[in-house]
Amino acid sequence: MYEFWKELHNAPYHFPMDESIWYESMNYDVDSDGRELFTEIDTEDTGHAMVQYGYSAFGFDENGEISPEIHYPIIRDLAFAPAYRTEAEALLKKVLEYFKGEPRIYAFFHYFGMSACGRHGKLHDNDRHIAQLLERHGFVVEHENVYYMRQLKDTDTTDGRVTLQWRERTAGDCREFAAVLDGLEIGWGQVHFLPQGDIAYLRWIFIDSQRQHSGLGTAVMKQLCQELYHMGIRRFDTDTALSNTAAQGYYEKTGFVNAGITRSYYSK
């Protein structure tokens, strides 16, 4: 199924990976802190269409905190060539029957994407035929993000004003950092180091509000990109909400390329 999966997945976050990395990420994935993502997960295919679905191992309470008492029914992946919609629809109907009785079913839940794909769980706008099939069965858009990608090069330079202090790597291969200027922390972030070895994903970044619009945010990103390059990273991606135009401007100013819109869905 590995070769079949590669044929059907060509979004910017479907990075090259060998079969062992793919298998681990498909079946035994964890989040940034090493928590298993799913209590149960099944994958089915017809030879022309595939679906992966199951129950999450945890969810998020009303305060946004992780709760092991909450379990979401999730269609993690649905993929097919446009000519095989009938086969894909049969798979989708089977999944909907499996989740029958659930008040809400999620599809392409961002947090529960594959680690080998930066855990970007949303569906790319290029796969409009998949979105149309979901919509045909009562799914609506939950959230929209802009996806960004950046190639790191040895020509990425910094003026040396900002230094980064890295924390230990988590069980989920993430490292947080603090950006320091004149002995004071002025920014923070978290980077996910993907199992491929030369790809990293920026999970989040924040610059002290009193330091914004001073050029220091750009200096922090330049320092980050330079250090990641020297760690062996060549591809550095991230995303932000479609509504967050300030973050979009920041990423585009610091060399990231807009690679399209991605969406998550839920059933009404």
Regions found by a protein language model. Give the residues of each.
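Conserved acetyl-CoA-binding loop-helix of GNAT-fold acetyltransferases
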Residues: 83-98, 207, 213-227, 249-253
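A conserved beta-strand-loop-helix scaffold within acyl/acetyltransferase catalytic domains
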Residues: 12-36, 48-66, 173-175, 180-181, ...
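A structural microfeature
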Residues: 45-47, 143-144, 187, 260
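Conserved catalytic-core motifs of GNAT/GCN5-like acyltransferases
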Residues: 123-151, 239, 257-268
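Short amphipathic alpha-helix that is part of the acyltransferase structural core
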Residues: 1-25, 138-186
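A short, internal acetyl-CoA/4′-phosphopantetheine-binding micro-motif in the GNAT/acyltransferase core
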Residues: 67-69, 73-86, 205-213
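Short acidic/polar active-site loop segments enriched in Thr and Asp
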Residues: 101-103, 234, 257
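Conserved beta-strand-loop-alpha-helix junction that forms the acyl-donor binding cleft
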Residues: 105-128, 238-247, 264-268
